[in-house]
Amino acid sequence: MMEMRVGIVGGGLAGLTAAIALAEKGFDVSIIGPRSTDSNSYLAQAGIALPLLEGDSIRIHVLDTIKAGKYINDEEIVWNVISKSSEAHDFLTSHGVTFTGNELEGGHSYPRIFTIKSETGKHIIPILEKHARELDVNFIRGFVEEIGINNGKLAGVFLQGELLKFDAVVIAAGGFSGLYRFTAGVKNNIGLLIGDVALKGVPLRDMEFVQFHPTGFIGKRTYLITEAVRGAGAKLVTGDGERFVNELETRDIVARAIYMKMLEGKGVFLDARGIENFKDRFPYIYSVLRGEGINPEKDLIPITPVAHYTIGGISVDAFYRTRIKGLYAIGESACNGFHGANRLASNSLLECVVSGLEVARTISREKPKREVNDAPYSFNELGDVDSIREVLWNHAGIVRDEWSLREGLRKLKEIEVDERLKLVAKAVIISALKREESRGAHYRKDYPFMRKEFEHSSFFYPNV
């Protein structure tokens, strides 16, 4: 009997977890994409949220997640994911990951963020990649241009115009925060495959919810000042020393408060001068800031909100299946209602591990087989991506209203860019227009309150 071939697009935490779990079950696995160090998982500083400490519980973590998500989370999904926290922890530690401490972050009732010197991704990703290679996972470097689908049936993926045939494909290529002008994530995370599968009949979910990290630092490039710095006691202040927000509120509230102060013409700073042993607790941030001429033990740190995490994505079920047989999505590429309207800090790495393990079980159970051997190929070039970034930043950013969103739609029509990227941007704007309320990461100044009639997820169907 021939081995089942599984192609995983993306080598971040979700992709590597799925690859290892599938390879351990005997599947022929390939990871297709850039180096794993070019993933947002690798950049993850704080850590992974796990309710494993004394006094904490799955129930409390679930309640924190739903409160942060402003009550439109899929509660069954939230329970499913968080109840697998011990399995996620055991998977990581059994493969050589050693956590060095626990931190408190905004929205959490307990210091349940398991971290590795606040450089968690840089430690986890190389360890898992080493294990994947030892299991003979095939790493194919390159840019997946599109998913090969023929009349609703999966054929594989296209790499430089060549169809690589697989029985199952798992999209683990991250979200689309790179479609915003300012992001601390990987700039290549532009959601191309999210738009690709949408054009081919897969609905998108909750696309209006884009999370902005409150404390980005723009220097030689854009960096994140991890939430854990505020958890350790850093304060947010204006240039004249005014404190204006609870630093440990959820990210949507803090980001919006900072943005409003900036609209008043006030600079906003992070004051970390009261943190003892900053250099030892946050070595990466310390080295970055010193390289930019700032000593966080003596100086205020200028910050700005930046696009950080896209809550919406490819609509999947509890088993990470799309509506196309053999096609799955996990991690930030996917959306099944876990985060609701706003992601609780450090829940993303938990979702990456859990979704990677769960999709491996799903594929092992269903054993899909490729039914077609070819598919149409249409990729040419990406086009004017920077203009999309400007439109989304200016018209579908931290604060929105009907006029600005409609103006963004108008500008979008004039941009010469790959239709799939235009579709992702259109999904964000139209979903934001339809949600005539403010909830979580989506804030409409013309509808500044939550409304009961919008207490549900949104779905975007490109052909409707």
Curated annotation (Swiss-Prot):
Gene Ontology CC entries for this record: cytoplasm
Residues binding FAD: 11-14, 40-47, 332, 348-349
Top-level division of the source organism's lineage: Archaea
Pathway where it operates: Cofactor biosynthesis; NAD(+) biosynthesis; iminoaspartate from L-aspartate (oxidase route): step 1/1
Function comment: Catalyzes the oxidation of L-aspartate to iminoaspartate, the first step in the de novo biosynthesis of NAD(+).
Protein family per UniProt: Belongs to the FAD-dependent oxidoreductase 2 family. NadB subfamily.
Name listed for the protein in its UniProt record: L-aspartate oxidase
UniProt organism field: Pyrococcus horikoshii (strain ATCC 700860 / DSM 12428 / JCM 9974 / NBRC 100139 / OT-3)
